[in-house]
Amino acid sequence: MGVTVKQEERSQETRSRILAAAEQSFAQRGYDVTSVDSICHAAGVSKGAFYHQFPSKGSVFVALLNDWLAELDRQFVAAQTGGESVPRQVAAMAAGVNEIYHVAGTKWNILLEFWAKSKADPEVARNTVEMIRKYQGFFQQVLDRGVSEGSLRVENSNLAATLILSAVLGLLLQGILDPEGQDWGALMQRVLAVLMESMSRRKP
């Protein structure tokens, strides 16, 4: 049992080192320039150890995005606890995104790389589509709850969820390309507040 635990710990440490090295290289040099050899060299692992953890460079790319999205999901789950109304939950989600936005650092560059590779790499493309559909469905469920509880008036929750996701992704893209142009995280909070107000049952 003890040997198995130690092996699992070493395996997890190796995975973490590979991901950390890949994240830095993807952000600084780009996906295409980064090679498996360069990741292994920076992580201090053999290629055999790399391929034991990941079948390809693309799978490392996907794992980095999924790890980052897992933190976003935790923020969203936390925002839905406490029995607040849906508009207040969305405000809390936006605040969580704002927080992540300011601490994510190089991850935003990786997100841009991820989008760019979606046209050329089938694995990356599949995961990008899954990500978009996942969050579109999530926002639709949130809006449907708002309608059920009486806090929102939405005729087409699918369309409204698409609008919310488009606003979020559009602001993320602008923030990546022009990081000093605005406080993009704070702007996202304001934009989502306006969208929620437009769907609110309360009269202005």
Regions picked out by a protein language model, each given a short descriptive name:
Residues G44-F54:
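Short hydrophobic/aromatic patch on the recognition helix
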Residues Q7, F26, S35-V36, K47, ...:
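Amphipathic alpha-helical segments enriched in hydrophobic/aromatic and basic residues
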Residues T14, K57, L64, W68-L72, ...:
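Hydrophobic/aromatic residues within well-ordered alpha-helical segments
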Residues M1-R29, V33-V45, G58-S59:
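Basic, helix-initiating cap at the start of DNA-binding domains
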Residues A125-V129, R133, V147-L195, M199-P204:
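Hydrophobic/aromatic-rich alpha-helical bundle segments in the mid-to-C-terminal region
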Residues Q89, H102-R126:
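Amphipathic alpha-helical segments used for helix-helix packing
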Residues Q28-D32, G83, A104, E149:
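Short coil/turn segments at alpha/beta junctions that flank glycine-rich nucleotide-binding fingerprints
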Residues A63, V77-T106, A160-I164, M188, ...:
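Hydrophobic alpha-helical connector segments
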